[in-house]
Swiss-Prot record:
Family of the protein in this entry: Belongs to the UPF0215 family.
Coiled-coil region list: none
Record-linked Pfam families: DUF99 (PF01949)
Protein name: UPF0215 protein STK_03040
Length: 178
């Protein structure tokens, strides 16, 4: 089974409010080997996260670093083409998220994000409790997470996606590409 880690890159605060782009990146693993990396750009606080993720090369299952990318850009789980595990290493504060959404966004993202956060499932793994929202069987999702919890609670595909996307976006920013 091919498993992807999905994460976004760094962006400066001045990009908030749709004033810039950052990286959305997929790292595809077969067992513990990286077999593919793909990325594209998303608008910070935009609404293109779902379409960009659907255009990336991914594995059979995607482990997403949360539901929001590039600020409050987001993915709509019901529109994703692949199987997914939306992963949180700790429970998000729904009150803070709701307050931020109410202040800045009055569109579908509010309802989608609040619905997912409200319906996270706590899963006890060998490395501690995590919170997920998935379209997989819960036992299968737990097995995938535990298989890739090599060093800590965060699955290896997410750790690597984070490192590469942060480094890539910082590099592209330094070259004034984003």
């Amino acid at each position: 089974m091919l498993v992807s880690g999905i994460d976004d890159g760094y962006f400066p605060l001045k990009y908030k409010g749709r004033n810039g782009r950052t990286v959305m990146l997929s790292v595809v693993f077969k067992d513990y080997d990286i077999i593919d990396i793909d990325f594209d750009f998303i608008i910070v606080d935009g609404d293109d996260g779902t379409s960009v993720l659907n255009s990336l090369q991914t594995g059979d299952v995607c482990i997403l670093d949360g539901l929001t990318f590039g600020g409050f850009n987001f993915v709509n789980p019901s529109e994703l083409k692949s199987k997914y595990i939306i992963f949180y290493s700790s429970k998000p504060n729904i009150f803070k998220i709701t307050r931020a959404l109410d202040r800045h966004f009055n569109d579908e993202r509010r309802d989608i994000i609040i619905n997912v956060i409200s319906n996270l499932t706590r899963v006890s793994t060998l490395r501690g409790d995590v919170y997920i929202y998935t379209n997989l069987d819960l036992k299968m999702a737990k097995n995938i997470i535990e298989e890739y919890q090599v060093f800590d609670r965060i699955p290896l595909p997410l750790k690597i996606a984070h490192e590469i996307s942060s480094s890539l976006s910082t590099f592209l920013l330094s070259k004034k590409i984003i």
